[in-house]
Design a protein with these regions (language model features):
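Hydrophobic ligand-binding cavity/cleft-lining segments
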Residues: 1-51, 164
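Hydrophobic beta-strand positions in extracellular immunoglobulin-like domains
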Residues: 14, 63, 115-117
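Short amphipathic alpha-helical/adjacent loop interface patches that line ligand
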Residues: 26-29, 143, 147
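Catalytic cores of transferase enzymes with a strong primary signal for eukaryotic protein kinases
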Residues: 32, 43-47, 59, 119-123, ...
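Glycine-rich portal/gate segments that line the openings of hydrophobic small-molecule binding cavities
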Residues: 34, 44-97, 110, 145-164
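Beta-strand/loop substructures that line and gate deep hydrophobic ligand-binding cavities in soluble
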Residues: 89-145, 161-162
């Protein structure tokens, strides 16, 4: 594997949620800036598929991590099996494939995020051989923010439901 190639497998657990609830958010990337705001700064739809399947939907992303750099990339839905799997082909500042897999557990939802990417920003390519541990830490930070964002989101929903 080249120094600028990465494989990240991240597990999340969202307690008290159903697969359908989590799917509603993770399959709608335009919602990411509301619950994953520290990482997803902007998401816009570039193309909707004509057949309504979701395959071929193209979105433009502006993201960042804890480190002081931003990533601009396009994600195209390559495969989708509602409500348990969505696969995104990424291109731009990084290229590769990301797959979200959801499974219902007794007390919540397990989410596996599997990213296989090549980062093409000049400084990542130039300094990857010494910076890879820091880039991996940055990815873990971003993923932890996403898990926390979903947990907080569903916690708020429960509070609203309890008060109604």
């Amino acid at each position: 594997m080249a120094a600028n190639e990465y494989h990240f497998l991240t597990p999340w657990f969202i307690p008290g949620a159903t697969v359908e609830q989590v799917w509603a958010l993770v399959s709608d990337a335009t919602s990411f800036p509301t619950w994953w705001r520290s990482v997803f700064l902007e998401v816009s739809v570039e193309q909707e598929p004509e057949d309504g399947s979701g395959v071929g939907k193209r979105l433009r992303y502006h993201t960042k991590g804890y480190l002081p750099y931003h990533l601009y990339w396009t994600g195209t839905v390559a495969a989708i099996e509602p409500p348990t799997m969505i696969e995104i082909a990424a291109s731009g500042d990084f290229n590769g494939v990301g797959r979200w897999t959801l499974s219902q557990r007794e007390n919540g939802v397990y989410v596996a995020l599997d990213w296989r990417i090549t980062v093409d920003q000049w400084f990542v390519k130039k300094f990857a051989f010494i910076m890879n541990p820091l880039f991996a830490w940055n990815h873990r930070w971003a993923m932890a923010c996403g898990e926390e964002g979903l947990i907080v989101h569903f916690g708020r929903l429960k509070l609203k439901g309890a008060g109604a």
